[in-house]
């Protein structure tokens, strides 16, 4: 990203640069010259973290202290960095958990570490969940992307190569970041960055809050948590379902197992893929035949575990 710095060149500087005569008739007045540069002239941004904190995967608060939206307690939304040198791109990891918990290991740190091995930096997003509802959850996810974009130079990533990956309920949140900017705004430089990802990857994802989303042992409380007292409001159900703004979706990778007994893959994964294809959007969809739900990397499953390598292929094509 290019940032601009106003450089004021004094008379003495110009004389030095151009060897000008300093007599009154040949003097050059002071001028303000706007210069665009990538690095040496970039606006000085002092990040609120150190290299040591990054290396230690310290949680980085994404909201200013005392200005966390929709707050009800002392919960501090954060991102956890997993960085590599010369990153091919950046993955924002949204763990699942039905919005009543967050599976930060199996669908968070373990996923980030695997992408590191393939040359991608990653951030695990510690968004809020129950008792918080969708306003806070989406605000955290949007802000996390903006935060990483704003400090992209310090993180050593390309701010045009940021993908979001979501598992189960985290998949729903991933889709929402592609279609919605948070209604909550604060007046700071970070909030001026785009909150939309450049690519989207979904694993056994919930993509709609409508009827039939869940099956068997599925967590039917998820719409109630996300929408709160408005859980039966059809307008809001539609707003926070994949079909709300299908044309806003970036390149999308969808993977699921046909043994899933929690989330109805036909009404979520397949329905989203069909809508993307109908809209002429790029979509890659993969169906696997083993495992059930909540698998994360799922290395022990011969078929399902192929998703990770296929996601790397997808990223390589999307981040050309």
Show the residue positions of the predicted features.
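Conserved alpha/beta-hydrolase "acid-adjacent" motif
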Residues: 261-270
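Short beta-strand element of the alpha/beta-hydrolase
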Residues: 88-97
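Mobile cap/lid helix-loop segments that gate and shape the active-site cleft of serine hydrolases
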Residues: 65, 205, 209-244
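Primarily recognizes the serine-hydrolase "nucleophile elbow" in alpha/beta-hydrolase
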Residues: 143-216, 237
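N-terminal cap/lid segment of alpha/beta-hydrolase-fold proteins
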Residues: 35-86, 134
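Short beta-strand/loop motif that positions the catalytic acidic residue
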Residues: 253-260
């Amino acid at each position: 990203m290019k940032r601009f710095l106003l450089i004021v060149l004094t008379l003495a500087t110009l004389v030095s640069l151009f060897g000008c005569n300093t007599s009154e008739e040949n003097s050059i007045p002071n001028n303000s010259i706007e210069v665009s540069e990538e690095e040496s002239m970039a606006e000085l941004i002092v990040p609120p973290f150190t290299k040591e904190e990054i290396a230690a995967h310290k949680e980085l608060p994404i909201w200013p202290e005392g200005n966390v939206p929709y707050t009800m307690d002392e919960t501090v939304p954060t991102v956890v960095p997993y960085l590599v040198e010369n990153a091919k791109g950046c993955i924002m990891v949204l763990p699942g958990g039905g919005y009543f918990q967050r599976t930060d290991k199996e669908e968070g740190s373990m996923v980030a570490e695997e992408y590191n091995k393939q040359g991608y930096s990653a951030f695990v997003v510690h968004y809020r969940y129950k008792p918080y509802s969708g306003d806070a959850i989406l605000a955290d996810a949007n802000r996390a992307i903006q935060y990483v974009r704003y400090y992209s130079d310090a993180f050593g990533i390309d701010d045009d190569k940021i993908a979001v990956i979501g598992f189960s309920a985290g998949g729903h949140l991933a889709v929402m970041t592609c279609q919605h900017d948070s209604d909550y705004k604060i007046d700071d430089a970070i909030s001026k960055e785009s909150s939309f990802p450049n690519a989207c990857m979904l694993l056994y994802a919930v993509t709609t809050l409508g009827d039939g989303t869940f099956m068997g042992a599925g967590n039917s409380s998820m719409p109630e948590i996300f929408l709160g007292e408005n859980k039966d409001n059809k307008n809001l159900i539609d707003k926070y379902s994949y079909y709300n703004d299908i044309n806003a979706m970036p390149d999308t990778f969808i993977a699921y197992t046909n043994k899933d007994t929690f989330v109805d893959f036909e009404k979520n994964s397949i329905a989203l893929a069909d809508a993307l294809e109908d809209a002429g959007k790029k979509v890659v969809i993969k169906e696997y035949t083993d495992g059930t739900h909540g698998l994360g990397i799922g290395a022990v499953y011969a078929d399902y575990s192929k998703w990770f390598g296929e996601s790397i292929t997808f990223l390589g094509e999307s981040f050309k």
